[in-house]
């Protein structure tokens, strides 16, 4: 099941509930075409991977949370364990981007775009 997150407090509660398990958060918008294509995929993954926590944040309804999580484009998927973003990268381009913007000390795994295969592969890897 995909939990709908409406604000920062719900987000913190969601991450706390996930604890040591993987939490996958989709930042999206109901008006975004690629986001619409990913909704059924994301839901299907939540059914398939019962031991993973899944949540969706609509950036139009939660702009403060989107800003706090540094969401620049949608859909964006971030993965967490123990309330911390997972420290893996899938592409060198992302590392360079974070290095240039000063985030090298807080490396994260996230990716943007509607790539269902990549999302599922990374979820399996991090479980």
Swiss-Prot record:
<comment type="function">
    <text>May be required for post-translational modifications of proteins required for acrosomal biogenesis. May act by reducing disulfide bonds within the sperm.</text>
</comment>
<dbReference type="GO" id="GO:0070062">
    <property type="term" value="C:extracellular exosome"/>
</dbReference>
<keyword id="KW-0963">Cytoplasm</keyword>
<dbReference type="Pfam" id="PF00085">
    <property type="entry name" value="Thioredoxin"/>
</dbReference>
<keyword id="KW-0333">Golgi apparatus</keyword>
<feature type="disulfide bond" description="Redox-active">
    <location>
        <begin position="32"/>
        <end position="35"/>
    </location>
</feature>
<dbReference type="InterPro" id="IPR036249">
    <property type="entry name" value="Thioredoxin-like_sf"/>
</dbReference>
<dbReference type="InterPro" id="IPR013766">
    <property type="entry name" value="Thioredoxin_domain"/>
</dbReference>
<dbReference type="GO" id="GO:0007283">
    <property type="term" value="P:spermatogenesis"/>
</dbReference>
<protein>
    <recommendedName>
        <fullName>Thioredoxin domain-containing protein 8</fullName>
    </recommendedName>
</protein>
<keyword id="KW-0676">Redox-active center</keyword>
<keyword id="KW-1015">Disulfide bond</keyword>
<dbReference type="GO" id="GO:0001669">
    <property type="term" value="C:acrosomal vesicle"/>
</dbReference>
<dbReference type="GO" id="GO:0005737">
    <property type="term" value="C:cytoplasm"/>
</dbReference>
<keyword id="KW-0221">Differentiation</keyword>
<feature type="domain" description="Thioredoxin">
    <location>
        <begin position="1"/>
        <end position="92"/>
    </location>
</feature>
<dbReference type="GO" id="GO:0005794">
    <property type="term" value="C:Golgi apparatus"/>
</dbReference>
<comment type="similarity">
    <text>Belongs to the thioredoxin family.</text>
</comment>
<dbReference type="GO" id="GO:0030154">
    <property type="term" value="P:cell differentiation"/>
</dbReference>
<keyword id="KW-0217">Developmental protein</keyword>
<keyword id="KW-0744">Spermatogenesis</keyword>
């Amino acid at each position: 099941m995909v939990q709908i997150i409406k604000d920062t407090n719900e987000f913190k509660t969601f991450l706390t509930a996930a604890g040591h398990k993987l939490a996958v958060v989709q930042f999206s918008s109901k008006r975004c075409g690629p986001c619409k294509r990913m909704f059924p995929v994301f839901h299907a993954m939540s059914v398939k991977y019962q031991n993973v926590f899944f949540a969706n944040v609509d950036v139009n309804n939660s702009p403060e949370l989107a800003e706090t999580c540094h969401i620049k484009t949608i859909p964006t998927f971030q993965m967490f364990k123990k309330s911390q973003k997972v420290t893996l990268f899938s592409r060198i381009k992302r590392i360079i981007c974070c290095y240039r913007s000063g985030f090298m000390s807080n490396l994260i795994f996230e990716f943007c775009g509607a790539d269902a295969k990549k999302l599922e592969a990374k979820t399996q890897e991090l479980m």
